[in-house]
């Protein structure tokens, strides 16, 4: 299975996020899942790429020209797919992937989560987004989604489009279930 991972490219974040991300990368490789990601060489993006490669897995990087020109491309990609911008990257990652996992991240990660989820809600695809809620990182987003649903701003149950995993065991069940 091809699992797209959305995550932070920031290096200055909670060190536990790196440890948990390494465990996920190891699990992906050992279970034959390919990594599809933004192809950047910093932060959790770099961490997940290195972990997958260290355990014999395959990496597919969807790399915008701005990242490449800045010398920030992950150096050990098995496949590099170049694109013009972040919108193209999301479209290409959607086409390349079977499901999506969101690790801790910022504005870019939120954009990716909600772009994929919105496309699912109106029927463009039926691929799930899983929030990997390590250390409760996504709790405020989960509360926001619940609040929006309570106010009838979301049609149906948002959990039909976005799942939540609090640990690797839950994540594995959702990915393989």
Predicted regions: what they are:
Residues 1-96, 132-176:
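A cross-family phosphate/adenosyl-ligand binding-site feature
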Residues 59, 124-127:
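Short, structured loop/turn "capping" segments at alpha-beta junctions
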Residues 88-123, 130:
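Active-site/ligand-binding-proximal alpha/beta "capping" segment
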């Amino acid at each position: 299975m091809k699992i797209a991972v959305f995550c932070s490219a920031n290096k200055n974040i909670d060190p536990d996020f790196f440890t948990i991300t390494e465990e996920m990368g190891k699990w992906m490789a050992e279970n034959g899942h390919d990594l599809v990601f933004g192809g950047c060489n910093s932060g959790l993006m770099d961490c997940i790429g290195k972990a997958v490669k260290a355990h014999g897995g395959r990496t597919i990087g969807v790399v915008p020209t701005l990242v490449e020109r800045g010398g920030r491309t992950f150096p050990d990609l098995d496949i590099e797919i170049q694109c013009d911008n972040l919108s193209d990257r999301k479209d290409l990652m959607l086409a390349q992937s079977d499901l999506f996992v969101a690790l801790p991240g910022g504005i870019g990660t939120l954009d990716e989560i909600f772009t994929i989820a919105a496309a699912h809600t109106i029927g463009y695809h039926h691929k799930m987004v899983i929030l990997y809620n390590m250390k409760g990182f996504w709790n405020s987003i989960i509360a926001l989604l619940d609040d929006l649903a309570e106010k009838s701003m979301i049609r149906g149950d948002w959990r039909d489009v976005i799942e939540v995993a609090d640990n690797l065991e839950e994540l594995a069940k959702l990915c393989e279930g």
